[in-house]
Amino acid sequence: MIPVLLVTICLAVFPFQGSSIILESGNINDYEIVYPKKVNVLPTGAMNSAHPCCDPVTCQPKQGEHCISGPCCRNCKFLNSGTICKRARGDNLHDYCTGISSDCPRNPYKGKYDPMKWPAAAKGSVLM
């Protein structure tokens, strides 16, 4: 029997449980949750209701889906490249989704050299 570590997001339905659990894979239909000196059996279908993007057994995105959560993930898909995921503040510029990740990478540019706002400024010039 190989224990499988499940990530908390798939089990958000069960707030009384710890930050992670181990699923004993002897009989996967029983969904046995193994704790030290204690075994609980979840009701049938309980794992399936946790998150619409998440495979209830592997806690990975379901087949055909890109992501489970994150600032650049909506309805189980990555947001388009160039979508603002963090608004500008002070001297910092907007941060944009890449279209290939659910993370929101930090924009390395400052001021008028933001390549999403001023693409002409970045063409053929050296940015310092």
UniProtKB/Swiss-Prot annotation:
It comes from Echis ocellatus (Ocellated saw-scaled viper). The keyword Cell membrane does not apply. A motif (Cell attachment site) lies at residues 89-91. Belongs to the disintegrin family. Dimeric disintegrin subfamily. Coiled coil: none annotated. Residues 21-47, 115-128 form a propeptide. Disulfide bonds join 53-76, 67-73, 72-97, 85-104. One of its GO terms (cellular component) is extracellular region. Keywords: Cell adhesion impairing toxin, Disulfide bond, Hemostasis impairing toxin, Platelet aggregation inhibiting toxin, Secreted, Signal, Toxin. Expressed by the venom gland. Its main location: secreted. This is Disintegrin EO4A. Heterodimer with EO5B; disulfide-linked. Residues 1-20 form the signal peptide. GO terms for molecular function: toxin activity. Negative results: does not inhibit alpha-1/beta-1 (ITGA1/ITGB1), alpha-2/beta-1 (ITGA2/ITGB1) and alpha-6/beta-1 (ITGA6/ITGB1) integrins. Poor inhibitor of platelet aggregation. The disintegrin inhibits the adhesion of cells expressing the RGD-dependent integrin alpha-5/beta-1 (ITGA5/ITGB1) to immobilized fibronectin. Inhibition on alpha-2b/beta-3 (ITGA2B/ITGB3) is low. It is found in: Secreted.
